[in-house]
Structure formats: structure tokens, C-alpha cells
């Protein structure tokens, strides 16, 4: 399957796994916003530390604005392969197109490391 129009870079599996774990940790010890509407609000306010977007969103237009908005606000974002992975890591029993870490809690070190690696990927 071809990459969706909103996927701006390939996320290595190891980095995707690290982001999934950071999202789980932030869900347990910090604050996580779930769902595209909430994520959009936190990006617009500049309060998101890291945005996680699923690669399998259909229709793609649901999340197509998120990378553009995040770049505009200089907020890092990363992709996970499925909505179920994003939803599960965010503490949901269903999939979600996107989530964001607002307060990293115990995942602060991991988030900083992920942000560095994302910057390298986007170069």
C-alpha cells in the first residue's frame, strides 16, 4: 500500500516502538490528548510536546492538516503504523487517528530523545 499523503517521512520501527512506549508512559504519569480534534486544539495552543499520528487513517483528510499545523507551530510529530497502536498507547480500547503528549510525566527523557531523532529524520 502506498504511503498516505500526510506521511512526510518514514519512521523506523525502533523509533515507532519508542514513541509508542513514551505515549503509554505519558498516559500513566502525565497528560495525553486523544483524538484529532483534541490534538488539533493542543497544537494550535502550542501545548503539545509530541504528536503521534496513525499511518492508516482513511480518509486521509481527517489528519492531513496535522503535520502542516505542527510544522507551523514547530511541534514534533511521528507516525505509528495503525490507529489501534495509537489508541492502545493512549489508553483507549479503540483506535484513534492521532494523540499528543501534553505533559510527558515520567517519559520526559524519552520524548526529548524522540524529538532529536525526528529532527534528524526530517533533514
From Swiss-Prot:
UniProt-listed Pfam families: Ribosomal_L7Ae
Superkingdom: Archaea
Subcellular location: Cytoplasm
Disulfide bonds listed in the record: none
Entry GO MF terms: ribonuclease P activity; rRNA binding; structural constituent of ribosome
BP-aspect Gene Ontology terms: translation; tRNA 5'-leader removal
Record-level GO cellular component terms: cytoplasm; ribonucleoprotein complex; ribosome
Main location: cytoplasm
The entry's keywords: Cytoplasm, Ribonucleoprotein, Ribosomal protein, RNA-binding, rRNA-binding, tRNA processing
Keyword Ribosomal protein: yes
InterPro entries: eL8/uL1-like, Ribosomal_eL30-like_sf, Ribosomal_eL8/eL30/eS12/Gad45, Ribosomal_eL8/Nhp2, Ribosomal_eL8_arc
Quaternary data: Part of the 50S ribosomal subunit. Probably part of the RNase P complex.
Family designation: Belongs to the eukaryotic ribosomal protein eL8 family.
Task performed by this protein: Multifunctional RNA-binding protein that recognizes the K-turn motif in ribosomal RNA, the RNA component of RNase P, box H/ACA, box C/D and box C'/D' sRNAs.
PANTHER family reported in the protein's UniProt record: RIBOSOMAL PROTEIN L7AE FAMILY MEMBER (PTHR23105)
HAMAP family: Ribosomal_eL8
Name of this chain's protein: Large ribosomal subunit protein eL8
Gene: rpl7ae
Amino acid at each position: 500500500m502506498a504511503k498516505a499523503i500526510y506521511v512526510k517521512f518514514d519512521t523506523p520501527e525502533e523509533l515507532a516502538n519508542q514513541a509508542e512506549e513514551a505515549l503509554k508512559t505519558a498516559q500513566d504519569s502525565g497528560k495525553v490528548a486523544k483524538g484529532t480534534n483534541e490534538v488539533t486544539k493542543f497544537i494550535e495552543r502550542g501545548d503539545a510536546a509530541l504528536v503521534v499520528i496513525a499511518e492508516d487513517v482513511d480518509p486521509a483528510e481527517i489528519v492531513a492538516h496535522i503535520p502542516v499545523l505542527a510544522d507551523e507551530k514547530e511541534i514534533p510529530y511521528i507516525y505509528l503504523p495503525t490507529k489501534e497502536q495509537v489508541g492502545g498507547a493512549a489508553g483507549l480500547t479503540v483506535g484513534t487517528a492521532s494523540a499528543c503528549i501534553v505533559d510527558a510525566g515520567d517519559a520526559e527523557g524519552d520524548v526529548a530523545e524522540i524529538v532529536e531523532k525526528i529532527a534528524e529524520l526530517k533533514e
